[in-house]
């Protein structure tokens, strides 16, 4: 439980400051999710084009 509490504390600090390395890692994860969604959408378009 203590470890989880520390993790949440670090997450809050990263969001508030935005200068922490962990905060930057989160910002990197967001574009990755967007790229994955784009790949899925493009894959759907490719399938429709083949059909």
Swiss-Prot record:
<protein>
    <recommendedName>
        <fullName>Protein alpha-3</fullName>
    </recommendedName>
</protein>
